[in-house]
Curated annotation (Swiss-Prot):
Gene assigned in the entry: TLR2
Gene3D superfamilies in the record: Ribonuclease Inhibitor (3.80.10.10), Toll/interleukin-1 receptor homology (TIR) domain (3.40.50.10140)
Main location: membrane
Residue spans, topological domain Cytoplasmic: 609-784
Extracellular side: 19-587
Modifications the protein undergoes after translation, according to the UniProt entry: Ubiquitinated at Lys-754 by PPP1R11, leading to its degradation. Deubiquitinated by USP2.
Site (Interaction with bacterial lipopeptide): residue numbering on this chain: F349
Species in which this protein is naturally found: Macaca fascicularis
Cross-referenced InterPro entries: Cys-rich_flank_reg_C (IPR000483), Leu-rich_rpt (IPR001611), Leu-rich_rpt_typical-subtyp (IPR003591), LRR_dom_sf (IPR032675), TIR_dom (IPR000157), Toll-like_receptor (IPR017241), Toll_tir_struct_dom_sf (IPR035897)
Positions of short motif ATG16L1-binding motif: 761-778
Location(s) in or outside the cell: Membrane; Cytoplasmic vesicle, Phagosome membrane; Membrane raft
Protein name stated in the entry: Toll-like receptor 2
Cross-link (Glycyl lysine isopeptide (Lys-Gly) (interchain with G-Cter in ubiquitin)) at residue(s): K754
Amino acid sequence: MPHTLWMVWVLGVIISLSKEESSNQASLSCDHNGICKGSSGSLNSIPSGLTEAVKSLDLSNNRITYISNSDLQRYVNLQALVLTSNGINTIEEDSFSSLGRLEHLDLSYNYLSNLSSSWFKPLSSLKFLNLLGNPYKTLGETSLFSHLTKLRILRVGNMDTFTKIQRKDFAGLTFLEELEIDASDLQSYEPKSLKSIQNVSHLILHMKQHILLLEIFVDLTSSVECLELRDTDLDTFHFSELSTGETNSLIKKFTFRNVKITDESLFQVMKLLSQISGLLELEFDDCTLNGVGDFRGSDNDRVIDPGKVETVTIRRLHIPQFYSFNDLSTLYPLTERVKRITVENSKVFLVPCLLSRHLKSLEYLDLSENLMVEEYLKNSACEDAWPSLQTLILRQNHLASLGKTGETLLTLKNLTNLDISKNTFHYMPETCQWPEKMKYLNLSSTRIHSVTGCIPKTLEILDISNNNLNLFSLNLPQLKELYISRNKLMTLPDASLLPMLLVLKISRNTITTFSKEQLDSFHTLKTLEAGGNNFICSCEFLSFTQEQQALAKVLVDWPANYLCDSPSHVRGQRVQDVRLSVSECHRAALVSGMCCALFLLILLMGVLCHRFHGLWYMKMMWAWLQAKRKPRKAPNRDICYDAFVSYSERDAYWVENLMVQELENFNPPFKLCLHKRDFIPGKWIIDNIIDSIEKSHKTVFVLSENFVKSEWCKYELDFSHFRLFDENNDAAILVLLEPIEKKAIPQRFCKLRKIMNTKTYLEWPMDEARQEGFWVNLRAAIKS
């Protein structure tokens, strides 16, 4: 029994491990390049079923806690390994021994409390290493990175437990492109710990307090090019003289990000910055200034000149005492050498005129996302303000009048580039005044509905994208670049108005087509971006775009952004891929051919109708149908006559003097219908013929040469012919008054010809002895 339980337990463990491994494999996706992604897949361990071809493995945000020596042994070609945010607390000494080609290793935000140099010794190709967010106190007992000669980006430290930096920590590192140290809770710094790194392009230092800042700063002045201080409270910072022994500093840019500072501490910071002889750029991002702008220090000293600083950038500066802020007059002496200033999203509504006049070297000014209006801008751009200014950016402020804005800036004699996008202008006046050297104007996203002569003729670059324009007809002889995307234009601008145009970006309008002739009219055009329009994929447009191979060099967004909007069956397809049928592309020729074929068919039908009397058939059919549709006086047809006699007027003597006498005077008498005697006066002849035939028991045709030539006799034959078809009877009696060939009867009277071919007809004998027999036979035929 115990043996059985043991076997069941072993099998359960094996099955559980098998299921776990199967689940691990299902959470991974690998492409043909050997890049495997298993992020957020609830993995508990590193999958073992992958091949040696794997080059990149992303296992971030899983539940891996342990890495053994064998987990990564087979991945000898691995170049990138991401294990961030797992919960790893243990890595065996030789876990990375087979990863000699690894270049990117991310172990950030796990639970590694102790770091081992043996992990990194085999990683001779490593260029990127991230150890941020692990709860270690120091960077190990021995130097971790001394063997990583190719390392270029290093990130170490954490917010809570990393308290000590030692001299050995960075031994062996000579050059880094980026070094990030999260020393938020740093309590101990061994002098010259960072001095061993000879060159760092960009150093990011997280420090909550400034206590050790000066000591670290001393070691960085000769090795760091760009120094960034993050998340630091400098409210109580006080500068003390440094004994660096350095006359030259490599620091060219100093960035303060998410830093708290006061008027007094800013004065102390300026003292610190004055020690950096090569400082050129100063940046404040997301900082808080707890002051009113009085930077003279507690002893009312003059603000220290920061030296050679040429660029100052301030973004999202928060000033709690904004409405008590001073006029910045204490900063005036420091501004004369500054060439570039950016103050973005910091609630600036005015630059004092005196400050503007002191900015004598200023060439670039960016006041985006602030509160500037025309009235205060006029004060800022007062006479002699910003004398060297070439570029002014007032994007997303509160400007409302284009005419006033241009007039306000007339004092800026050297202004060439102006960005006033994302203001709300709506209306553009017919004329405006602008600085005479204007070359670039950005009016994008200003809600204008039309463009007028307000646009300066001197422009070389114009951006009016994302507005409500449906027409562009300005003559700008010097314009080289036009950005007019996201409007409502239906066609390309007139090339004759833009003779120097090199770049045209007109995507996402309502353009349906453009032609080779239109593009050729832009003689200097090098770049065209016209994707995202509602193209009608006509045969001409497709032929032009698909056959012009040189077009791909001009259309920078070809072919991905050129999609058909119509015809409907190709909507959404790329213009490059659409092929239309011959019938769609040669519709005019096809219609012409069909018309010709129809004409020939009609002509052929006409010839056939004429040859076989088709017109006559149609006329008779119509007349007969009309006659049959007439309302009858009685529901049943009344037979009034024994026979209707159809004869030629030239045979009237024989009919009236012989036939009538023999039949109507016979006992019992026959009642004959003769057109001379019995037709109703005033009634249509054709109606009389039809009614007489219908009211007669028989129809007697007195055939002769005269009968065949008579037009009215033909009508009587016609309607008798239709009666034969309609009633399917033998109501016709043929009397040959004189010999006549059957061929003399027209072909169209096929039924009568058939009767003559199949039944005996009566022939008037010239011999008087036989005439009595003729009358007997005729009476018998009428009675039948």
